[in-house]
């Protein structure tokens, strides 16, 4: 009921862009995995206001073994399972913005410092990931795609490939940005301006 009240109030105040993730609620736990999407989906069913909301969610990369039975990655099989599961929990037939929650490759994110390169790490090539997202767009399951917790190199590479190969273009970057964490300004701010890819700042307070 509290969640429903929050969504009712948000929409009444003109807040119509809602972002969630298959991983949520936060802090992430196995027993609450997917619950935020379920609550939003139940609200959609009750209110019949899906068309009033711009809905964003995220597919999780590697790290948490309980996600989708383990072995989660950005390969076509796991990605297909993820998008279908999110659609079911959200009780909708499309997602407005579908984001990669964090990089699949070994790199720095979530505040990690001291980059250590590892050529032995295995990850799906960006072109293949974009190809999978293209299939979801073609099927009408998602409309736009975006990134989260990504680096300047990763963002630039995705944008380069989408232009070269005619694949879906990343439309947004959801990274932390606030008075105590201004790392976005180091490299990603320039990418945002020059390549016209917007920031969805999280933890702004």
PLM regions: where:
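Short acidic capping loops at alpha-helix termini that bridge into adjacent secondary structure
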Residues: 50-53, 93-97, 143-144, 168-171
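N-terminal small/glycine-rich loop or linker at the start of catalytic domains
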Residues: 1, 53-70, 99, 104-113
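Short, well-ordered amphipathic alpha-helices
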Residues: 39-44, 83-87, 133, 155-163
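Conserved, mostly hydrophobic/aromatic
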Residues: 3, 10, 18, 40, ...
